[in-house]
């Protein structure tokens, strides 16, 4: 049996990313700490997240093809990302990972990679 070469392949590819992002933005759209920094219509935000996570976890480089180099910190600088919002974002992602039923060791690997990224995105101290 061939072992998957990437997290993307191991979790089932784009269909799983799509399910994860859909679940995630359902939580984001209802989270009082996150609503102020996200648009009312999350359609385009979710589309970009699908492209990013596909690439981030070893799938096709769709994000770069569509948007250029990720430069995620720079792209997020216009938004106040506090430790509190980082934690809210991670809580929404953890809930989405649970709902998507991504199995171990991939659930933990994904959450750890996204936790490091979320820490990197912080640009505003506690208020």
Regions found by a protein language model. Name each.
Residues 1-127:
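Core of compact, soluble alpha-helical bundle domains
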């Amino acid at each position: 049996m061939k072992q998957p070469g990437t997290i993307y392949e191991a979790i089932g590819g784009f269909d799983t990313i799509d399910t994860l992002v859909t679940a995630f933005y359902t939580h984001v759209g209802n989270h009082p700490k996150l609503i102020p920094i996200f648009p009312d219509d999350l359609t385009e935000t979710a589309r970009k997240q699908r492209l990013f996570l596909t690439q981030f976890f070893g799938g096709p480089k769709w994000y770069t093809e569509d948007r250029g180099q990720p430069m995620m910190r720079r792209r997020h600088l216009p938004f106040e990302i506090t430790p509190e919002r980082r934690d809210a974002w991670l809580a929404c992602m953890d809930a989405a990972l649970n709902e998507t039923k991504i199995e171990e060791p991939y659930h933990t690997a994904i959450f750890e990679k996204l936790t490091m990224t979320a820490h990197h995105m912080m640009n505003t101290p506690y208020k």
